[in-house]
């Protein structure tokens, strides 16, 4: 019984750790998307300032070119993080299912123990002697 309690605690810890990992990845995706939209605004401002919107034009602002490259890198990172997020969510779901299975086993054991204690109490009442249940 104690080993199952330890296993249950371990599984709960595992689920919480995986939940933190999912939250961390979601936070990174949000941050990267925010940075990309900030860069989009900066690119638009720089294009407006220079009056050149064609990236292949010789007078296109160097800052805007660099910002476009950074934005593209951020968006590529977001795409990579989204695949990692899907994988992390899948492992979280698996860990959660495992935890639920362990908790169901614990509930079944607790119910079995109650039944055994009730039987022991009945036997003790019938025989007039206290009856002990092995725990």
Language-model features: locations:
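Charge-rich amphipathic alpha-helical interaction elements
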Residues: 1-135
């Amino acid at each position: 019984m104690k080993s199952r309690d330890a296993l249950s605690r371990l599984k709960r810890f595992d689920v919480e750790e995986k939940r933190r990992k999912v939250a961390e990845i979601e936070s990174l995706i949000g941050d990267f998307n925010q940075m990309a939209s900030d860069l989009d605004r900066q690119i638009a401002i720089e294009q407006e300032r220079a009056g050149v919107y064609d990236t292949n034009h010789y007078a296109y602002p160097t800052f805007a070119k660099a910002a476009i490259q950074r934005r593209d890198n951020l968006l590529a990172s977001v795409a990579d993080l989204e695949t990692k997020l899907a994988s992390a969510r899948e492992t979280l779901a698996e860990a959660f299912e495992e935890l639920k299975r362990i908790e169901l086993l614990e509930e079944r054991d607790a119910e079995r123990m109650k039944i055994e204690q009730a039987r022991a109490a009945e036997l003790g009442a019938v025989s007039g002697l206290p009856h002990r249940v092995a725990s």
